[in-house]
Design a protein with these regions (language model features):
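Peri-transmembrane interface segments
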Residues: 30-35, 257-309, 318-322, 328
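Hydrophobic alpha-helical membrane-associated segments
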Residues: 43-54, 303-311
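Hydrophobic, regular-secondary-structure patches
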Residues: 46-134, 141-144, 155-158, 163
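Short, charged, solvent-exposed linker or helix-capping segments at domain edges/interfaces
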Residues: 145-150, 237-238
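Basic-flanked hydrophobic alpha-helices used for secretion and membrane insertion
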Residues: 154-157, 168-275
Length: 328
């Protein structure tokens, strides 16, 4: 007991002495030197925390948006040698039985060419104003529950179930938002809400009104022409209900890995690929994230070394220029 009291008294005394010496040093110190040291330490701290956070956060933000709006926690897609998910209705029924299932959306996909001046006569050798685009077929109600895509419509309005003659178009397909003119890369000019465009898939073409323009920062929407799923099936000559992707959202009661294992055990792996969001992220995105992490650590390390040297020089110069020294 006596030893404990002695330790506590010694600790209290040390704190009091340290506090007294600190106040005394601050009173006698050069205010500019102290300010410089505090500033360097603050900037060093910000460099360690903020720079790494910004570099990694840029990619993390893209991944989070991709996961939230495009692929969910689990994504089911066609095998690489197939064009669609086989037995899609059966797969959807299995998806709804996942413990922790919250929501899903079924999307039909394809590649299309969109033209805006198809009614005009062009001179020999000229190209029509057109662009290649991904074709995305959705159920408007189902997709809205999943991704809330209507909030990304920056002009015009969202699709409803009766809009068989209307489409949404991603901003990256429009010259107004992507003013790039390069060989092999075309965007649509003079296209706005209410314009008529022609969408062509192979030998099948149809005219549509542009009902809205999408800006989501997710390529799934920004580089796509979005139409009703029935229209995409018609354009791609698909006579069944086999879809391109099924994105699934889960609640917190189950992990994506557990949900993936459940789907594979239920036989979904026979019809399509089953991936977690982490598996589905493009490799280049993972490589960029890792590179930015290394770059952030290197910058922070260099900043720490420079700050340490700077503070040492400031303190050393301040010490040797003092008039009075204690114990010297």
């Amino acid at each position: 007991m006596a030893d404990r009291l002695t330790v506590e008294n010694s600790l209290t005394q040390n704190i009091k002495v340290g506090w007294f010496l600190a106040k005394r040093e601050l009173k006698r110190a050069n205010i500019w030197t102290t300010t410089l040291i505090v500033l360097v330490m603050t900037l060093t701290f910000l460099n360690l925390i903020v720079v790494s956070g910004i570099l990694v956060g840029l990619i993390q933000g893209s991944e989070d948006a991709q996961k939230k709006y495009a692929i969910g926690d689990i994504v089911i897609s066609s095998f690489l040698n197939r064009s669609a998910i086989e037995q899609t209705p059966r797969v959807v029924d299995i998806v709804k039985t996942i413990p922790g299932y919250r929501n899903h959306t079924v999307r039909y996909s394809g590649s299309a060419r969109v033209e805006s001046n198809y009614r005009e006569t062009i001179k020999p050798g000229e190209k029509r104003d057109g662009a290649g685009a991904s074709l995305l077929g959705i159920d408007p109600i189902e997709e809205e529950r999943f991704s809330g895509v209507s909030k990304f419509v920056i002009r015009g309005s969202y699709l409803d179930t009766n809009d068989g003659d209307s489409i949404l178009i991603g901003k990256n397909l429009l010259y107004e938002f992507t003013p790039i003119e390069a060989p092999g890369f075309q965007t649509l000019k003079n296209v706005e809400v209410g314009s008529r465009v022609k969408v062509t898939v192979g030998d099948v073409s149809k005219e549509y009104f542009v009902k809205g323009i999408l800006s989501s920062k997710v390529d799934e929407f920004d580089t796509s022409v979005v139409a009703l799923e029935s229209e995409v099936r018609r354009l791609t000559n698909r006579t069944n209900l086999d879809a391109g992707t099924i994105a699934i959202q889960l609640d917190s009661s189950i992990t994506p890995v557990e949900a993936k294992e459940f789907l594979l055990a239920s036989g979904v792996g026979e019809y399509a690929r089953v991936q977690t969001a982490e598996d589905a992220f493009p490799k280049f995105l993972k490589d960029i994230k890792a590179t930015f992490g290394i770059l952030g650590s290197a910058i922070s390390g260099i900043g720490l070394v420079v700050a340490s040297i700077t503070i040492f020089i400031v303190i050393f110069v301040n010490a040797i220029t003092r008039i009075r020294y204690i114990g010297i």
